[in-house]
UniProtKB/Swiss-Prot annotation:
Zn finger residue spans: B box-type: 92-134
Record-annotated B30.2/SPRY domain positions: 283-488
Catalytic EC class: transferase
Zinc fingers classed as RING-type: ranges: 15-60
Organism annotation: Homo sapiens (Human)
Keyword Coiled coil attached: yes
Coiled coil: 131-239
Protein name stated in the entry: E3 ubiquitin-protein ligase TRIM34
Single GO MF descriptor: ubiquitin protein ligase activity
The protein's Enzyme Commission number: 2.3.2.27
Family: Belongs to the TRIM/RBCC family.
């Protein structure tokens, strides 16, 4: 009912010329109203064609343009009508034209909007291309489906990019955490190295202090004894000086002889300067050594000892990681040592050996250069020095060794028949030795793990014609020689 009333009101305020709601309505003498623009155009046409007379387009009654009056009341009604909205529960609202109340059955291509048949005839849409809404609906549906498909594809791409970003973020955070741990580990190790160096320097200073103070104490004791002796002589001489002439003359030779013989023995001079003078360690060099050791430790392999063809004087542990040399009385053994169970014919490999309690040892790698095999030999007498010269590259040994508790040596890579042992200088005696093999490059390197990975010696341009075996020789020292498990 309300909708019908609104439609009736809308008809009353619709311009009979443009068929739109009145805009700036002007009332004629007959009572009808027109838009100011429409009546102005109509008046101009009348002046031109009818000799200046104008008539109402509704009833035909003539009017004078000068007598037209603005109808504010109708203008207010039009404004209120534009503000009126039909209730949402009216299902036909969307299908009806807001201006004419007719069904929206047409689509204007120029204005891209749905219109009714009256809108099509209005001045606003006159001459425009219109089609039925059913025809354009299918086209819109196809376009919407295409847009929907593209948007879903964009959504999938966005989700994929989001997942990639999350994965990259996780990977980045892991890299940062790994790098943080690596930095902390390296600095912890550097601090450990510095602490060890500090303790070593303090221990050296303490040992020198003890030795020097012992010398001072010995000198003081000696001077105390001499001072006591000279006091006794002085007392004796003073006492004799009080004797009578006969007493003094009868015993004069004895006291004079002692007085002439005795001389003050000066103690040995003790150096006023410290032998141990601390110099700050070269941190860059220490860091370089540490990094070199860390680099080769990446190739750490689990090496065990081979019990095949084992010499009689050698005993292996159950886990085949430790070898001990035992005496076979009354014989002395030509100790050929023991090979590793693993052999290498390519690649890079690293292992570590604990020799902390030994006073003699040999270790490195062995490569069979001839058809020689490891055999045990027991002899009543053996020249150890001559035996020691057998451990050289000419016979397939690339090794270093310790003899007589403090003499470290290595045979240079000379093929001469009379090689010389190269003496190695060790600032810190190695308790743990690392061995690195690069088969293709022909390199065998030895590292002093005890001294933060300092390089002991490096064989280069080694010629390996056969597989290479780790080699261990405890010599005649009964202390154990132990293979360290990886990363221990």
């Amino acid at each position: 009912m309300a909708s019908k009333i609104l439609l009736n009101v809308q008809e009353e305020v619709t311009c009979p010329i443009c068929l739109e709601l009145l805009t700036e309505p002007l009332s004629l003498d007959c009572g009808h109203s027109l838009c100011r623009a429409c009546i102005t155009v109509s008046n101009k046409e009348a002046v031109t064609s009818m000799g200046g007379k104008s008539s109402c387009p509704v009833c035909g009654i003539s009017y004078s343009f000068e007598h037209l009056q603005a109808n504010q009341h109708l203008a207010n009604i039009v404004e209120r009508l534009k503000e009126v909205k039909l209730s949402p529960d009216n299902g036909k609202k969307r299908d009806l034209c807001d201006h004419h109340g007719e069904k929206l059955l047409l689509f204007c291509k120029e204005d891209r909007k749905v219109i009714c048949w009256l809108c099509e005839r209005s001045q606003e849409h006159r001459g425009h291309h219109t089609v039925l809404t059913e025809e354009v609906f299918k086209e819109c549906q196809e376009k919407l489906q295409a847009v929907l498909k593209r948007l879903k594809k964009e959504e999938e791409e966005a989700e994929k990019l989001e997942a990639d970003i999350r994965e990259e973020k996780t990977s980045w955070k892991y890299q940062v955490q790994t790098e943080r741990q690596r930095i902390q580990t390296e600095f912890d190790q550097l601090r450990s190295i510095l602490n060890n160096e500090e303790q070593r320097e303090l221990q050296r200073l303490e040992e020198e202090e003890k030795k020097t103070l012992d010398k001072f104490a010995e000198a003081e004791d000696e001077l105390v004894q001499q001072k006591q002796l000279v006091r006794e002589l002085i007392s004796d001489v003073e006492c004799r000086s009080q004797w009578s002439t006969m007493e003094l003359l009868q015993d004069m030779s004895g006291i004079m002889k002692w007085s002439e013989i005795w001389r003050l023995k000066k103690p040995k001079m003790v150096s006023k300067k410290l032998k141990t003078v601390f110099h700050a360690p070269d941190l860059s060099r220490m860091l370089q050594m540490f990094r070199e050791l860390t680099a080769v430790r990446c190739y750490w392999v689990d090496v065990t000892l081979n019990s095949v063809n084992l010499n009689l004087n050698l005993v292996l542990s159950e886990d085949q990681r430790q070898v001990i040399s035992v005496p076979i009385w009354p014989f002395q053994c030509y100790n050929y040592g023991v090979l590793g169970s693993q052999y290498f014919s390519s690649g890079k490999h690293y292992w570590e050996v604990d020799v902390s309690k030994k006073t003699a040892w040999i270790l490195g790698v062995y490569c069979r250069t001839y058809s020689r095999h490891m055999k045990y030999v027991v002899r009543r007498c053996a020249n150890r020095q001559n035996l020691y010269t057998k451990y050289r590259p000419l016979f397939g040994y690339w090794v270093i060794g310790l003899q007589n508790k403090c003499k470290y040596g290595v045979f240079e890579e000379s093929l001469s028949s009379d090689p010389e042992v190269l003496t190695l200088s060790m600032a810190v005696p190695p308790c743990r030795v690392g061995v690195f093999l690069d088969y293709e490059a022909g390199i065998v390197s030895f590292f002093n793990v005890t001294s933060h990975g300092s390089l002991i010696y490096k064989f280069s341009k080694c010629c390996f014609s056969q597989p290479v075996y780790p080699y261990f020789n405890p010599w005649n020292c009964p202390a154990p020689m132990t293979l360290c498990p990886p990363s221990s």
